[in-house]
């Protein structure tokens, strides 16, 4: 747990990067590879921006290929001298001219406007609560490049079309020409669907209709209510009620994925998602399903690549059963507790955990100021292990002992099923 947190902190502090195809004294590289932090299954890299006085500032960038909109924090917009205008709900500014990733300039001018979340003054540096990033790199920018996300190696590569050598099984995909969003031809139970490829999402989603159909057809499939672990995306009010299920097998383009954890996509969000995709879709596959792969995006040829990088699957749902909301001030509010076998998985009540409490620390490690990925690393481990949660309620702090549970148990493999028969 501490090793994971320390590794992320090291990445943020050192900002090491290396460029390809650019020996000293020569022109700007045509492709670069830089270290990436995989935090709550999201890809975060270091980049530099030039401020008005000519100096440069290092910023953390969220690689967000499932979103066409450019977003940044108000602090960054102000630092760059951009004019910010606000409504009652959000702010915006002209897009920055460019960012520099590992020595390679990535122009952002193709996106006319950058969205800025409406935050209090003391949260001006917050792009999204629970993340340490101040700007994203959206699909509308990425679509002009070759892109490679190496999850096992914690690396990110970007280059001009034709400069990255992709490996692994490949398949043709549909790309929205207006915004770069990707739909991958897929099959579930021999029926064809489109599923988006969204490496900016920590968890995967299925349409309400398809989710219900699979749940009815497979009543013994592992399922639960409550967005714990990687399903705890942003701490939305409805996350304690989200339905989760493991799907036995998904053919995703050229590869087959087993025991895929998926969330039921609320109907209103699904309608917006499908409209933005510009074509029929049954949901999306997030990074949680692809952490063992090096995922290559060849936008110029409408092709994706999946090279296996490791075989071990990390138990992303062996966690303390809390549903959390990261706040703009760095604190974490408890939205709810997931049940296990019909009982609360964390002690409830006056001496336990209640909705609205704040998670102060886990085993003495402060939660405030951490990312979602760091906090869930604290809350994860081996089922049965005990964690000491420091809880705050009404200005009073007290400890609650909670055990790590094995949520959403994986389906048995085919050999086990045959033995049972």
Map each language-model feature to its residues.
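Bacterial N-terminal signal peptides
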Residues: 6-15
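Positively charged n-region of N-terminal signal peptides that target proteins for export
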Residues: 1-4
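Pepsin/retropepsin-fold aspartyl endopeptidases
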Residues: 19-421
């Amino acid at each position: 747990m501490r090793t994971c947190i320390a590794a992320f902190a090291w990445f943020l502090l050192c900002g090491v990067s290396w460029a390809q195809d650019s020996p000293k004294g020569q022109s700007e590289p045509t492709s670069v590879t830089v270290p990436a932090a995989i935090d709550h299954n999201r890809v975060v890299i270091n980049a530099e921006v030039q401020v008005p006085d000519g100096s440069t500032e290092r910023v953390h960038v969220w690689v967000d290929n499932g979103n066409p909109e450019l977003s940044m924090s108000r602090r960054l917009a102000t630092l760059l001298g951009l004019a910010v205008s606000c409504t009652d709900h959000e702010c915006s500014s002209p897009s920055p001219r460019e960012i520099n990733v590992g020595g390679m300039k990535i122009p952002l001018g193709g996106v006319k406007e950058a969205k800025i979340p409406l935050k209090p003054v003391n949260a001006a540096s917050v792009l999204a609560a629970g993340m340490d990033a101040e700007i994203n790199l959206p699909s509308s920018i990425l679509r002009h490049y070759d892109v490679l996300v190496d999850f096992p190696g914690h690396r990110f590569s970007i280059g001009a079309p034709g400069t990255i050598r992709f490996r692994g099984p490949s398949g043709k995909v549909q790309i929205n020409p207006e915004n770069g969003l990707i739909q991958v031809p897929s099959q579930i139970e021999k029926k064809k669907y489109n599923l988006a490829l969204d490496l900016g999402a920590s968890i995967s989603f299925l349409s309400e209709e398809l989710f219900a159909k699979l749940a009815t057809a497979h009543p013994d499939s592992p399922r639960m209510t409550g967005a714990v672990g990687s399903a705890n995306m942003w701490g939305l009010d409805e996350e304690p009620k989200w339905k989760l299920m493991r799907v036995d097998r998904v053919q995703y383009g050229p590869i087959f994925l087993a025991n895929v954890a998926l969330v039921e996509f609320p109907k209103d969000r699904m309608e917006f998602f499908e409209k933005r995709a510009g074509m029929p879709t049954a949901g999306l596959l997030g990074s949680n399903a692809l952490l063992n792969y090096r995922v290559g995006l060849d936008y110029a040829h409408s092709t994706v690549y999946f090279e296996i990088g490791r075989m071990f699957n990390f138990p992303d749902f062996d966690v303390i059963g809390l549903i959390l909301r990261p706040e703009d001030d760095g604190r974490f509010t408890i939205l709810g507790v997931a049940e296990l076998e019909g009982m609360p998985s964390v002690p409830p009540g006056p001496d336990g955990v209640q909705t609205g409490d704040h998670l102060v620390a886990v085993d003495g490690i402060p939660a405030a100021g951490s990312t979602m990925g760091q906090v869930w690393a604290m809350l994860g481990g081996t089922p049965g292990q005990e964690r000491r949660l420091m809880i705050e309620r009404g200005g009073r702090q007290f400890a609650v002992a909670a055990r790590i549970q094995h949520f959403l148990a994986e389906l048995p493999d085919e050999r086990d099923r045959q033995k049972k028969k």
